[in-house]
């Protein structure tokens, strides 16, 4: 056998033996918790029409999609993320179903990143979607589900960092930034690149008040106490409502007895445009 046929391409790997057994065990434990919360399994295709993952929907950039054509000439793409596929499926089959809808999923996703980035191009994604309920209680449910799922795997020391994209968007609107500038600034702040952010704001001649608040967003993280100050700094209703929403979610999580696992980070701004409200991650 030729030597090169024994190796995998850059960005993919074999999983076997004890590592694979451990992976299956963790997936099972997380799925048990999803089921206990009433989330139903859903399976979407490994590839879809390209437009499902198009830039307008706000998922992975086109250059990072694995694209190909079928015999009819349709442009198809391997899924880089489950959320757009689940949203499409819900819109097709569940429009007349009573809200909210609860789905959970497990499968591999594919992103054609540069080999120099050192990232896996095929990863397993497991998640849950709560559709049709925009309340603070729904936000708290998903955060609670994440906490309880991690605890169910045996983890004890972790934190859930919670952000609110609307806080940033409100200040950008108030400062009169266009969509392109907002998108670039979002990337700078997400990467904690304050020099790039400040240079951009100076080029756009943003007034001193808004510039100072936008530059501070990257450093706005911590416990519940700093949210009040963040609300005062924002001179617009949209941003203040975002802070109020975070406080409401925290109140619900406190009732669940989960407040010790929660912190806040207003500089956490997802590159996915379909995340318009609360976002969170564990570390």
Question: Where are these predicted regions, by residue range?
Answer:
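Short low-complexity, flexible loop/linker segments enriched in glycine and/or proline
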Residues: 56-60, 174-176, 278
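Short secondary-structure boundary/hinge segments and terminal tails
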Residues: 51-52, 168, 190, 271
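Positively charged, Gly/Ser-enriched RNA/tRNA-binding surfaces
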Residues: 20-37, 48-51, 62, 68, ...
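A short beta-strand-loop structural module common to alpha/beta enzyme folds
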Residues: 40-46
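Auxiliary tRNA-acceptor-end handling modules of aminoacyl-tRNA synthetases
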Residues: 1-19
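Catalytic cores of Mg2+-dependent Asp-rich isoprenoid enzymes
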Residues: 11, 51-57
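A positional/architectural concept
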Residues: 41, 75-79
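Short terminal or interdomain "cap/linker" segment that borders an active site or interface and mediates
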Residues: 160, 165-202
């Amino acid at each position: 056998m030729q030597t090169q046929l024994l190796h995998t391409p850059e960005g993919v790997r074999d999983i076997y033996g004890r590592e694979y057994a451990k992976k299956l065990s963790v997936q099972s434990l997380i799925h048990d918790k999803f089921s206990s919360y009433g989330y139903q399994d859903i399976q979407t295709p490994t590839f879809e029409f390209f437009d499902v993952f198009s830039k307008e929907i706000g998922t992975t950039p086109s250059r990072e999609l694995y694209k190909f054509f079928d015999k009819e000439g349709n442009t198809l793409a391997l899924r880089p993320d489950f959320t757009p596929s689940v949203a499409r499926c819900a819109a097709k089959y569940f429009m007349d179903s009573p809200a909210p809808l609860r789905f959970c999923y497990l499968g591999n996703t594919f992103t054609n990143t540069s080999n120099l980035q050192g990232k896996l191009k095929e990863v397993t994604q497991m998640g849950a979607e709560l559709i049709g309920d925009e309340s603070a209680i729904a936000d708290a449910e998903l955060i609670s589900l994440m906490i309880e799922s991690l605890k169910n795997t045996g983890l004890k020391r972790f934190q859930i960092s919670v952000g609110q994209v609307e806080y940033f968007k409100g200040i950008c609107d108030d400062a009169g930034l266009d969509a392109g500038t907002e998108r670039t600034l979002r990337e700078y702040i997400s990467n904690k690149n304050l020099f790039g952010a400040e240079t951009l704001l100076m080029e756009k001649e943003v007034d001193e008040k808004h510039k100072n608040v936008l530059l501070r967003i990257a450093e706005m993280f911590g416990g519940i106490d700093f949210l009040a100050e963040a609300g005062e700094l924002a001179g617009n209703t949209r941003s203040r409502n975002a802070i109020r929403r975070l406080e409401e979610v925290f109140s619900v999580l406190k009732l669940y007895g989960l407040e010790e696992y929660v912190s806040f980070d207003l500089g956490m701004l997802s590159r996915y445009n379909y995340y318009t409200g609360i976002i969170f991650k564990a570390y």
